[in-house]
């Protein structure tokens, strides 16, 4: 039985009937997705989240989208890839990596996101990154691009690009590096193997951290363990949460979308 349903998906992210294949619609779909569906490391037990390659898209659709629990990049961006494909977009999976991800997993095929080609132009689209980043399509271009007070640029490297961001009062920093090499889901097998090794390591007690976030009208909010970060009009504020009750309340607010 095919559970994945385009109209249910569109309604869940507040875009019912938005079936156009154009940049304006794509931008609305991406930002609405980021506002409606959180990034959440808590949506799945790690043992249930190791199937990156042979992902059951119907099961993930129910948990991550229909129930609104969110998930990681390989849940959210893979389902968004399917949604865009079924709407008629030309979509290509891409792989990226962060410095932390390379250190943790030892692979450059870490982060999963998408490239959309519209009228001969390429756009980066990402609905599953757990940190300050672009909330609308980003042109694959050397130009500096501004979104809601933050600036973005793509810096060419020997093996691809470095996506960099600068806030209203911060310096340029790398979000992640990537190439535009088209990917297959099987390319994430190495990451999956690393997940399985992590789960199987009985000496580790830190296998699942609290990492969640979502967008709002003019910014984003993230909680990583006890570090609470808000970005509003490009301005960042960071707090360390020491009170357990406040921590639990913030987790609930980020996941529910109630930013207060």
From Swiss-Prot:
InterPro entries, alphabetized: Arylamine_N-AcTrfase (IPR001447), Arylamine_NAT_domain_sf (IPR053710), Papain-like_cys_pep_sf (IPR038765)
Its pathway?
Answer: Antibiotic biosynthesis; rifamycin B biosynthesis
The record places the active site at 73, 111, 126
What happens in the null mutant?
Answer: Inactivation of rifF gives a rifamycin B non-producing mutant that still accumulates a series of linear polyketides ranging from the tetra- to a decaketide, also detected in the wild-type.
**Recorded GO terms, molecular function?**
arylamine N-acetyltransferase activity; lyase activity
Q: Which Enzyme Commission number(s) are listed? A: 4.4.1.-
Q: Which UniProt keywords apply?
A: Antibiotic biosynthesis, Lyase
Biological processes, Gene Ontology terms: antibiotic biosynthetic process
Role played: Catalyzes the release of the completed linear polyketide from the rif PKS by forming an intramolecular amide bond, in this way terminating polyketide assembly and forming the macrocyclic compound proansamycin X, an intermediate in the rifamycin B biosynthesis.
Q: Which family does it belong to?
A: Belongs to the arylamine N-acetyltransferase family.
Q: What is this protein called?
A: Proansamycin X synthase
